[in-house]
Regions:
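Bacterial N-terminal signal peptides that target proteins for export
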Residues: 1-8
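Short beta-strand-centered segments that line the small-molecule binding cleft or hinge
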Residues: 113
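N-terminal secretory/targeting leader peptides
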Residues: 20-110, 118-321
Length: 321
């Protein structure tokens, strides 16, 4: 005859199934990228800390949503959590572009300070859109990749120049280059087909996309350190019990510290790999540096006009740190 314990067993199994929460985490970069590896570690830490109650699945390389779609997906709870490049959304609100203002924060120490100065306003902005910021991690400093040698900004005239955010589109425009919108997941193909001849990005993305197979020159301009941010849908977060929320926040704090360290530690390694694979890694000429700085000043002025008193307060706070 059936055991009288069976109903209890079924109830226990059903209860554990109901208690388990599953989140999807779309990310735009390859599984081998340090940001993605950090996300996977974050998900594993959450799984372990919650005893399997919260399972986060990382979908790398824009396999679930393309880079520009991830924020909207989290906002609409199509994905409960996601990783975004903040500056992708600078047209939506200038605050998302504060970390790509050219030559404002060009080192990890400076980027940390700018992150700290802008975090309260960023928290508030995301909260107004139904999201919570869990953590940020900076990319290595941005340099200029080119198929041909560049001595001055005029050498970029007419060149197909990848733009991935409003700042890079504006730079292309001011240098007389031809802006082409290409996300990181499509960059390898764009180089192979000749759709792009020059771009600004980190040594990390250059290495991930094997830029050295198509591009000869990397100018180490150290223009800015853009940030990725991991955001969560506020309602999805609020639906977790307190212990699970605390586990997520602790794992996020650990991921932020680990991610920033990894980014800084790997900066020189990425440039060495580009060199080993035949690229010339060079400082920009004095003329090019001066021209870049001029463009940077214009972009900062433009940003301050759009960002208003809130933007000025952030840069003032950053300047005092």
């Amino acid at each position: 005859k059936p055991s009288r314990f069976l109903p209890l067993l079924f109830a226990a199994v059903a209860g554990s199934a109901l208690a388990q929460v599953k989140w999807d985490l779309p990310a735009a970069y390859p599984a081998s990228n340090f940001h993605t590896e950090n996300l996977v570690q974050f998900a594993a830490d959450v799984d372990r800390a919650t005893g399997g109650k919260l399972k986060i699945t990382v979908h790398a390389n824009a396999s679930l949503f393309k880079a520009p779609e991830i924020k909207r997906a989290v906002q609409g709870n199509q994905a409960q959590i996601g990783e975004i490049l903040l500056s992708n959304f600078a047209n939506e609100h200038p605050l998302y572009g504060v970390d790509v203002l050219p030559f404002v924060a060009t080192s990890y120490v400076a980027a940390h300070k700018l992150d700290k100065a802008s975090r309260p306003a960023l928290d508030k902005l995301l909260a107004s859109q139904g999201m919570k910021l869990l953590y940020t991690v900076a990319w290595p400093p941005q340099g200029l990749y080119s198929k041909k040698p560049l001595n001055a900004a005029s050498d970029l005239k007419g060149v197909k120049f990848r733009s991935y955010n409003p700042a890079t589109a504006k730079i292309a425009e001011m240098f007389g280059a031809q802006p082409v919108t290409i996300q990181a997941a499509d960059l390898s193909q764009a180089m192979a087909t000749g759709a792009v001849e020059s771009f600004i990005t980190s040594g990390s993305t250059g290495y991930d996309t094997k830029a050295y197979e198509h591009i000869r020159y990397f100018y180490d301009t150290q223009a800015w350190l853009p940030k990725n941010a991991v955001i969560v849908n506020q309602k999805a977060f609020d639906a977790l019990d307190k212990a699970t929320q605390d586990a997520v926040l602790k794992a996020a704090a650990d991921a932020e510290a680990r991610g920033w360290k990894s980014s800084e530690d790997k900066t020189a390694w990425y440039l060495d790999q580009l060199k080993k694979n035949g690229m010339q890694v060079l400082p920009p000429s004095a003329q090019m540096s001066a021209e870049f700085k001029k463009v940077g000043d214009v972009l900062v002025d433009d940003w301050l006009k759009k960002a208003g008193p809130e933007g000025k307060a952030i840069l003032d706070a950053y300047g005092k740190m």
